[in-house]
Amino acid sequence: MDDVKDKLKGFMKKVNLSSSSGKFKGQGRVLGSSSSSSAPPVNPIQNRFNSSQAPNPTPRPKPNPNPLPEKPLSSSDQKISGSTRNPDHDPVRAPQDGFDPYGAFITSSNRSQNGYSLSMFECPICKNPFTSEEEVSVHVESCLGDTNGDESSFEKDNNDNDKSEMEKLVVVYLSGKPSESSIDVLLRLFKNIVKEPENAKFRKVRMSNAKIKEAIGDVAGGVELLELVGFELKEENDEIWAVMDVPSEEQSILINKVVGYLEKRKTESSGSSAQVMEPVAPKKIDREIRVFFSVSENVASRIEVPDSFYSLSADEIKREADLRRKKIAESQLLIPRSYKEKQAKAARKRYKRSMIRVQFPDGVVLQGVFAPWEPTFALYEFVSSALKEPSLQFELLDPVLVKRRVIPHTPAPGQKPITLEDEELVPSALIRFRPIETDSLVFTGLRNELLEISEPLS
């Protein structure tokens, strides 16, 4: 019994000696914690056993100022935990030399008040925030383009100011409503200077000249335009002259701009005035109405007019002679029929008037004068106004005796109006009147006013 006690004492002594050795000496603590911590040692086996039994322990309401001891981590566990830990969630980490190995390459470096990153990326040029690096890369190119454009903004503003001043003066000049000839005089002056800048004759203008005075002196903004391009007003021999030195390259460019803007505004003003202007009423032609007694068709077809009706000017006579020479030369060649008809149509264009007679069923003949370019419905209106029954429908037959055809009243939809010249009713023609009678409307002849002025056809 005593031997057993002695052996037990020896075993306990060995256990105490091994626990107090240098290998296991010291107090267990969490890495990074203070060595002065006085927390009692924790048995890892007991801790593991307790954690397996209660994985979700209820936290105590009493706060513990000292950190709880944790299980020491091996070197491999430290590497894994260090690599998976987000550096942005570590409020203690702060770069000493300004370089953060865990930070984004392009970042706004702005932190929220809670201590975590906003995951925003900023442009290194304009400092605008973006949500991704791709958006920053796309934005940088446009941002660089904007900075290059800002460098030339001052020069662009100067050009715009010069242009606006030039435009204002041109508008003021045109608002004075100068005549077309006055604008042409000013344009001719500027164009001559650009074309021959060394010619002093174009660079010295006498303001008392009648055309210059009308085009520039009497129009608001005219003198200012001269001064804008480089002219100076001087007095010589009791007269005012606008004198200009040899224009520089910049002045030549400015003169060209003024010329172009003047021509542009001139075209716009003329176009707008043409749109605003009311459509011009067609020139009223004197029909020179005459009415003849009942005669036969052969007698009515003999139309005799005075020589003045066919009177031609000197230019028309010369043109007629040229046409005759061409006709003689072309008669010796084989010419297609279509070309001959085209030539005959061109020959009829020299007539300015056409005398047309309309023969009615009772033998009365109505005569009127028309222009070759008038449409055929003008002939129908003329005949309708002469009837006692203006609402009577009728047709006018072509003067061709072989096969009479109806002269069209109105053109087909989508076609241009047919003229008297197109129907070969120039320079004179005799056409027939054919009424379209109904039970209520019949042909009753011409109006009494026209019958009273009727005369025999000699």
Swiss-Prot record:
PUB domain span:
181-248
Q: Where is this region: Disordered?
A: 1-103
Instruction: Tell me if Nuclease is a UniProt keyword of this record.
Output: no
Q: Which GO terms describe its molecular function?
A: zinc ion binding
ZnF segments: C2H2-type? 121-143
Q: Does the keyword Zinc-finger apply?
A: yes
User: What does the entry give for GO biological process?
Assistant: defense response to fungus; response to fungus
Question: Where is composition skewed (Pro residues) in this entry?
Answer: 56-70
> What topology does it adopt in the membrane?
Peripheral membrane protein
Q: Assembly state and interactors? A: Interacts with CDC48A in vitro and co-fractionates with membrane-associated but not soluble CDC48A in vivo.
Cross-referenced PANTHER family: PLANT UBX DOMAIN-CONTAINING PROTEIN 2 (PTHR47694:SF1)
Q: Kindly provide the name given to this protein in its UniProt entry.
A: Plant UBX domain-containing protein 2
